[in-house]
A protein has these predicted regions:
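Short, solvent-exposed micro-motifs at the edges of structured domains
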Residues: 1-226
């Protein structure tokens, strides 16, 4: 495996002692590791046996390429990934108020997300290409320190006891992890079918139900979920 990283940035001194930077950052990963199950029943086998009774069709071992064996994991190095981001950074390190602030707008895509994932179709890497599990589209982080003005001009014991105090904090906001609804089937984890309707749940219910489950149903055995 190897990766290629590149970036282009512009830095500038701004008014009020603020330093600013805006950058494009990219990364390409090639020959990444994955461990697909090469003995998983293919969709072609499922389609070819669609006319069989359900009891026979649900016996996944009878549909495996290598009969008599369960999962066979093969380590391959044929996966790819790419990352593209706009990064904005600002810092002020002088005066009573100092801070550093950064914002990242990014997207990370790959056809694998760890060499042990259980992909729905290990024979079709293009179908598995999409956002990785650690993808966060928006990340905002700021750290700040404010030097309290109380007793700043005092001297001696009064200043040592009550002066020189600072208030500081760290704030971070980021978008959540993307979610792909899946379900367990006879051939492993499968994507669900989107049947329409609003996915997001508004109001207080969103803390109990993260998304509208009625918008998804199990996909048929003979094709991939949407």
């Amino acid at each position: 495996p190897y990766s290629m990283s590149y970036s282009l940035s512009i830095q500038r001194e701004l008014p009020w002692g603020i330093f600013g930077e805006i950058a494009y950052v990219g990364n390409q990963g090639r020959h990444l590791l994955r461990q697909p199950d090469i003995n998983q029943a293919t969709f072609d086998a499922l389609v070819a046996n669609a006319a069989l009774p359900t009891a026979q069709r649900s016996s996944v071992n009878a549909l495996r390429p290598y009969k008599g064996y369960a999962a066979i994991r093969m380590r391959l190095s044929d996966s790819t990934s790419n990352y593209n981001a706009l990064q904005v950074y600002a810092a002020k390190r002088r005066g009573g108020l100092t801070f550093t602030t950064s914002y990242t707008w990014s997207k990370a895509l790959a056809d694998t997300s760890g060499n042990g994932d259980n992909l729905e179709d290990p024979f079709n890497r293009r179908f598995n290409y999409g956002p990785v599990s650690f993808d966060r589209r928006h990340i905002f982080v700021t750290t700040y320190t404010y030097r309290l003005p109380f007793f700043r001009k005092s001297k001696g014991l009064l200043y040592n006891a009550l002066g020189g105090w600072e208030a500081s904090g760290i704030t971070r906001w980021q978008t959540g992890q993307l979610l792909t609804p899946t379900g367990n089937t006879s051939i492993g984890t499968r994507r669900a079918d989107y049947v329409g309707g609003e996915v997001n749940v508004a109001g207080a219910d969103r803390f109990v139900q993260w998304f509208n489950t009625a918008a998804f149903v199990s996909a048929p055995d003979t094709r991939r979920g949407t």
